[in-house]
């Protein structure tokens, strides 16, 4: 039985980093994951929720649930957006049992890309080489809301010629923080500079 996989491309990927969305498609296709891109998808509501505007986030969450309801899995190249769906959608509908059930069910089927590849598909790269020294920074939302920690490391460990160097404070915020970098750019830049110097 083929599973129905939907690709969710977050707003910032769509608007600022479309190459990340295209790379996600390339990765899914490389591993034989048949997927669809629902053209009626919209923002998950995270920017509004992060800004404390929960009433504005709720209609977006309803639309999102309706669009992705018929899929076995929803895959996103974003830990923060997947975290919004999995962790925070149930909070939006705490007073509405029918929508709460739908939100929780969708959250359980929503994955950040690396987690989907490792935890659901059980994939590991084979025949891939990249002779370089690299480090890895944990996404705050991916790590804290989704438990994405070992998955990216497992994928990187399977790459031939790759040397992994531990990043000091790899679990410390990079300064992006969703809307934090927009609201507090000076603090955000200072945090990312410290991270880059590590």
Language model features: what each stretch is:
Residues 2-198:
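Iron-sulfur cluster-binding electron-transfer modules in prokaryotic oxidoreductases
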